């Protein structure tokens, strides 16, 4: 585990974006942990998040020409990632986002920011079913651009309806790589280093039942 990945977990725990307990998911599964990027609610937390997303993107070695944030949670994430790329990696990238409702006045349309062109890195919090990100892929395709990668905070490494995770299904279907700052293996590693045997046992059992590699 890289230092920034451990820092991300610690920030998520401090902000209560990552919690341990019993949480009923939309799928009906009772999960021993829950992740909600909406809990990162301060300027400092967002600045740190931007650095983590930027580092994950740079480490992956993906070539890209711009940043895109899907509405709504992806918008601040894309903004802070673009800022971090400029400040820490000397990559001054254009960025854009979409709104969920079409605006009839002013500039109109659903897209805001830089024109969608070239290779587009999409920044989002998580991929659950992949519906929202598929809509964004359609927008990028319609603009004549190409998706370079999708970057998320956490990959739950968890089966969907079949044997594959939502992320694996999306990668197979679209050919677009999905990069994550951390995955469930990193969470397990962190719990082990902290000596948190109770949560480690619960998350390990959940992973054995629903996990994918």
Curated annotation (Swiss-Prot):
GO terms for cellular component: cytoplasm. GO terms for molecular function: magnesium ion binding; orotate phosphoribosyltransferase activity. The keyword Glycosyltransferase applies. Keywords: Glycosyltransferase, Magnesium, Pyrimidine biosynthesis, Transferase. Its EC number is 2.4.2.10. CDD domains: PRTases_typeI (cd06223). The keyword Nucleotide-binding does not apply. Pathway: Pyrimidine metabolism; UMP biosynthesis via de novo pathway; UMP from orotate: step 1/2. Gene3D superfamilies: 3.40.50.2020. It catalyses: orotidine 5'-phosphate + diphosphate = orotate + 5-phospho-alpha-D-ribose 1-diphosphate. Its cofactor is Mg(2+). It is an enzyme of class 2 (transferase). Belongs to the purine/pyrimidine phosphoribosyltransferase family. PyrE subfamily. This is Orotate phosphoribosyltransferase. It comes from Saccharophagus degradans (strain 2-40 / ATCC 43961 / DSM 17024). The lineage of its organism: Bacteria, Pseudomonadati, Pseudomonadota, Gammaproteobacteria, Cellvibrionales. The gene is pyrE.
């Amino acid at each position: 585990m890289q230092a920034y990945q451990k820092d991300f977990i610690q920030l998520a725990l401090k902000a209560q974006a990552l919690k341990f307990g019993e949480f009923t998911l939309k799928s009906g599964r009772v999960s021993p942990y829950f992740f909600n990027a909406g809990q990162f609610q301060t300027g400092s937390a967002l600045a740190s998040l931007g650095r983590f997303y930027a580092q994950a993107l740079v480490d992956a070695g993906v070539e890209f020409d711009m940043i895109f944030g899907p509405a709504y949670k992806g918008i601040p994430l894309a903004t802070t990632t673009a800022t971090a790329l400029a400040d820490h990696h000397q990559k001054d990238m254009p960025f854009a986002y979409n709104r969920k409702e079409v605006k009839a006045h002013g500039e109109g349309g659903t897209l805001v920011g830089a024109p969608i062109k070239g290779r587009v890195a999409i920044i989002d919090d998580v991929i659950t079913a992949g519906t929202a990100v598929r809509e964004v892929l359609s927008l990028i395709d319609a603009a004549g651009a190409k998706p370079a990668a999708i970057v998320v905070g956490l990959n739950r490494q968890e089966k969907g309806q079949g044997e594959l995770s939502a992320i694996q299904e999306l990668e197979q279907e679209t050919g677009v790589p999905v990069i994550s700052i951390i995955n469930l293996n990193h969470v397990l590693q962190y719990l082990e280093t902290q000596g948190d045997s109770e949560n480690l046992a619960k998350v390990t059992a959940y992973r054995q039942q629903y996990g994918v590699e």
